[in-house]
Regions:
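Radical SAM enzyme core and accessory elements
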Residues: 1-9, 260-290
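Canonical Radical SAM [4Fe-4S] cluster-binding loop centered on the CxxxCxxC motif
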Residues: 1-45, 53
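Core AdoMet radical
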Residues: 14, 31-41, 55-68, 82-98, ...
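Radical SAM enzyme [4Fe-4S]-AdoMet core and its adjacent flexible, acidic
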Residues: 39-41, 123-128, 132-139, 154-265, ...
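Acidic (Asp/Glu)-rich catalytic clusters
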Residues: 50-52, 103-109, 143-151, 179-181
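Surface-exposed amphipathic alpha-helices with a cationic face
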Residues: 73-81, 142-153
Length: 290
């Protein structure tokens, strides 16, 4: 896998879709907490705007999009033949259990399901997310999804490194092994951005595992903040997304970072991000209340 830096404009063919601002969790580090207010979902306009957009990789986000499972199904069905890839990011709300047949129909049409978790223990995961409708989304629902061979291949589980939760080698090791045990085949490990007080360094807590696997991590800013790593202790695909000084004021820039930053002053990077809001409006980036 190529090492990626999203700030370098490499995701030029992606359309972020905020399907809804509604969510049944209240994560303290939610990246959408300062986003603009709910605009009211209009599926027909969303489908029309998506088809008109030149972007061909669609990432459906929230809030929690699968709270509106029927509308997600309608939207995905409406755009499927017009785009290349469709991905959904979710924390697996309980209403999936209540209409699992519709969820399976959505899974059959999409290319990837990005599942956001905060812990390997269901109760702790619910607590960290401040879930308003807690349920066994890992040991029961996620396991059920992964029992289907075709669906399991589409699942990627994302875990944030957060102080007080997954913040040391033992807890991260237990998380990865728990995912392996229920049939997950791909895990993405994220360092927090713009949350200095809660930040945990992957390189620091997993230094023994990295050494054992002969992996030396270089500056995420200069050499790619997202990359795949192959750790000897695990039989699964692992993607690592690290933070740099641009998104964490407590991190220092290396000499190579300063050189790259200097060069970027003379290289114009065209803005490539596009965001579709739930009312069908397209924007050149994520809008905030500020």
């Amino acid at each position: 896998m190529k090492k990626l830096n999203s700030c370098d404009g490499l995701y030029h063919d992606s359309l972020d879709v905020r399907f809804t601002k509604a969510c049944d969790n209240r994560c303290p580090f939610c990246i959408e907490k300062n986003g603009v207010d709910e605009k009211g979902t209009n599926i027909e306009k969303m489908i029309e705007s998506t088809i008109k957009s030149p972007k061909k990789d669609i990432l459906i986000l929230g809030g929690e999009p699968l709270l509106m499972l029927d509308k997600v199904y309608e939207y995905v069905k409406g755009i499927r033949s017009h785009v290349r890839n469709i991905y959904i990011t979710t924390s697996l709300p309980i209403n999936i259990v209540h209409d699992y047949e519709k969820f399976e129909a959505v899974m059959d049409m999409i290319d990837g399901l990005n599942v956001s978790l905060q812990h390997y223990d269901d109760d702790i995961n619910n607590d960290i997310m401040r879930a308003t409708r807690p349920h066994q989304r890992i040991g029961v629902l996620l396991k059920r999804i992964c029992e289907d061979e075709n669906h399991a291949n589409k699942v990627r589980v994302s875990i944030n490194l957060v102080k007080g939760a997954i913040d040391n080698q033992m807890s991260l090791d237990m998380f990865i092994r728990k995912m392996e045990s229920i049939g997950v085949r791909h895990v993405k490990i994220n360092e927090l951005q713009h949350e200095e007080e809660l930040y945990v360094s992957f390189e620091e807590i997993f230094k023994d595992k990295l050494k054992k696997s002969n992996i030396k991590l270089k500056s995420p800013y200069s050499h790619g903040c997202q990359r795949e790593i192959s750790l000897k202790d695990y039989d699964m695909k692992i993607t690592l997304k690290r933070a740099c000084f641009c998104v964490n004021g407590n991190l220092d820039a290396t000499l190579s970072d300063m050189f790259k930053a200097f060069k970027k002053q003379f290289v114009k990077i065209e803005p490539t991000q596009a965001v579709l809001y739930e009312n069908g409006d397209l924007a050149s980036g994520w809008m905030t209340k500020e």
